[in-house]
Amino acid sequence: MAYDQLTIRPYTAKALELKNQKASNLDIVVPVIKDNDHNYLIVEGENFIIEFNKHNGYLSRYEADGMQLLNPGAQLTPNFWRAPTDNDYGAGLQHRYAVWKNPGLKLTSLKQSIENEQAIVQAEYEMKAVKGKLFLTYVINNEGAVKVTQKMEAGKEEKVSDMFRFG
């Protein structure tokens, strides 16, 4: 049985950076953001199309090199729930954490911009059930690679149960 744990070499995670890909003698083609559709915010590049649903802010279409990477009807959504384990059931956590199964996300803002020759889409949500806010940021480079960042701010005075997962 171990009594202590020693750190031999501390682990430092590398920053997840998304850079544009450049061919040797070709200029970078900046993604184009089209905001003229009533239902979708569209980000297009030479070889990809990405659509965001304007009603809920979710990434709803991802096509690269003519191939659908998201099934029709599917959406990339934030998740705060996982299937409870036997130990969770024994502790009654499926009831205590139930508010996180559907925290009532309501889109309050969907913004887009071009920065550093990359498309940026930012969605802000109000989470009524847990009195918090959620911020999703999508950075899209010229090849159609997407970096998704999720940040949540909890209500300061609210007493909300823990969550199973954040992701």
Where do the language-model regions lie?
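Carbohydrate-binding surfaces of carbohydrate-active enzymes
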Residues: M1-F52, V148
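Acidic (Asp/Glu-rich), glycine- and aromatic
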Residues: Y3-Q5, R9-P10, H55-G57, G132-F135, ...
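A short, surface-exposed interaction/processing loop segment used at functional sites
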Residues: K19-K22, D65-Q75, T149-V160
